[in-house]
Amino acid sequence: MRDDGTPSDMLYDRVSVSAEVYAALGDTPLLMSGDHTGDYNEVGVMKSLAVQMGVPSEDVFLDHEGYSTYESLYRAKAVFGAKRMIIITQEYHLHRALHIARELGMEAVGVSADLRPYRGQTRYNAREHLARFKDFFAAAKGEYDGHLDPPVDLNGDGNET
């Protein structure tokens, strides 16, 4: 997300592909996970954009504490009860996300959200190598030190998140 509160190109493309998948599958809830610290509300921006793209607000669930890929996926299972999922993210990041989901015992398939070249991709690739190393061990241990909210039913109303 940009400093002015608008979605970055990567974030925009993730939401755009998510809206396309939603339209193709129909009545499937979307779980948007990201950072919501203080005034930085990544998940709020994602939901607003998804709704603008035609996804009903009640079908968009927010995980406000998805500070890392591992945390997002752990919380998807522990808080939201996800057992099967479609992970939508950029290609460079997709393999790690799928590995984590599978290590946590979830069935997962991935859809690439690469709709254009991205500025700073070399930096993202370098960061991804470090994150793979870190998350490999975290996923193998299957532990989480963060806060877990009460369970949320993905068959409920996403507006309550």
Report the location of each language-model feature.
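A structural signal for short, hydrophobic/glycine-enriched beta-strand patches
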Residues: M1-A126
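A general structural signal for short secondary-structure boundary/capping elements
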Residues: T37-N41, V109, A131-A138, L154-N159
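Short linear elements at protein peripheries
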Residues: E143-T161
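A transmembrane-helix-recognition feature enriched in membrane-embedded lipid enzymes
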Residues: N125-H147
